[in-house]
Amino acid sequence: QEGNYWDTFLNLDFNYDKRNQKFQTTDGFRSFYSIDLPIISDNETLKNYYSYSQYFELFDQNISSFSLMLNAAKSISNKDIKLSERINIPTSRLRGFESGRIGPKDGDDYIGGNYGVAINFASTIPQILEQSQNVDFLFFIDAANLWGVDYNKNLDDSGSIRSSLGLALDWYSPIGPLNFSLAYPITKEDSDKEETFRFNLGTTF
């Protein structure tokens, strides 16, 4: 897939946000849909992305969340999409694994997929640092699947669901949101690259 490509896309986003607040959300939901429509493109890749998050209370002094992500990239002219346009599962959606190091492989190369899905559940752990209002401890479970190789069906990885569980700390510090997570893979493949600890600056889970 070497060479020069010309791509012009029209991006449309639809965001319906009913969360009570952006950070440390305690109630509400957010539904987001994005589509990239090829206008002038060498391989005419159509991209669709959807995410949904719901926040609720399971018991007193607890906040839990459920989220879903769906992602798809496919050429509308039945051509093979470029490697740079193939899908990978974000590390925020599948903790415990290195970024871009799961899913279909071509030889030694991880090539991503045409389709991706992720489901996440997180729940705060009460009775820890009760006096601190800017720190959240959470238990989480992640599950994801990445599949579809348009140029070689034999490389498909649709039957391999990856999952993990772990603990996370969200700290809303003066310099911005910080996240620390420890994750343990539950289901995996031998070719996957694991990542037990992850630190993020500027984002929380």
Q: Each predicted region: which residue ranges?
A:
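C-terminal outer-membrane beta-barrel translocator/porin domains of Gram-negative envelope proteins
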Residues: 1-135, 139-143, 147-149, 191, ...
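Outer-membrane beta-barrel "beta-signal"
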Residues: 11, 169-176, 194-205
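A short, acidic, flexible beta-alpha connecting loop/helix-capping segment that sits on the rim
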Residues: 183-189
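Short amphipathic alpha-helix initiation/capping segments at coil-to-helix junctions
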Residues: 110, 114, 158-162, 171, ...
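Outer-membrane beta-barrel transmembrane domain signature
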Residues: 143-165
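A short, conserved beta-to-alpha structural element at the edge of catalytic cores
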Residues: 162-183
